[in-house]
């Protein structure tokens, strides 16, 4: 089952921002960062290219050899099967905490190649930065934090009718008893999943097969 994540709406707004900076997406592992970036790339761009510094260790040399975005992109093109076109390709740097030079390169993409759409993601990035004494290009990136699935996102997927009802009412209106009971039930179910995407999808998919 597809869970609509609010972070993708924020990505869409960022895409249309004239003074756009690369996104640095932070968050724990297994909360859906990679899924969100790839979904955004598929839905909003002609192409998307993902470079994973954890799985593709050879990528590190590309950033160690040059700080020029033009040179970096020319070499990265050798590692993917889609063109890297400004405005048409979303460039994803995944697990960027594994390559300090790639993290630093975001500064140069901001200054010298702002026409490219770049999202970089890191797991436990704050820990890595402190432990390895890495530097984040402050002021040259838009830092975003992603969390596990919220109750709002869960309810939207699990019980669309109740979600739509809640969205349409006035905030000061008293909720009918049936809605309150439904919300309590859904919240208990949400707590069982813990907001982790795999657990939420497994629960909702299993219900669909019953």
Regions found by a protein language model. Name each.
Residues 1-210:
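Phosphate-binding site recognition
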């Amino acid at each position: 089952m597809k869970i609509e994540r609010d972070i993708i709406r924020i990505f869409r707004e960022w895409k249309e921002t004239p003074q756009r900076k690369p996104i640095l997406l932070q968050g724990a592992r297994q909360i859906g960062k990679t899924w969100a970036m790839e979904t955004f790339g598929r839905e909003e761009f002609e192409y998307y290219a993902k470079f994973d510094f954890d799985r593709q260790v050879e990528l590190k040399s590309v950033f160690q050899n040059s700080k020029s975005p033009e040179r970096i992109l020319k070499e990265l093109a050798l590692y993917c099967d889609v063109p890297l076109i400004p405005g048409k390709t979303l460039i994803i740097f995944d697990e960027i905490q594994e390559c300090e030079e790639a993290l630093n390169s975001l500064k140069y993409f901001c200054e010298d190649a702002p026409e490219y759409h770049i999202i970089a993601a890191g797991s436990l990035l704050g820990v890595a930065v402190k432990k390895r004494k890495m530097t984040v290009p402050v002021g040259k990136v838009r830092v975003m934090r992603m969390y596990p699935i919220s109750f709002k996102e869960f309810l939207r997927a699990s019980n669309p009718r109740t979600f739509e009802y809640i969205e349409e009412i006035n905030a000061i209106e008293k909720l009918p008893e049936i809605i309150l009971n439904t919300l309590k039930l859904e919240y208990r179910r949400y707590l069982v999943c813990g907001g982790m995407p795999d657990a939420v999808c497994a629960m909702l998919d299993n219900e669909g097969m019953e």
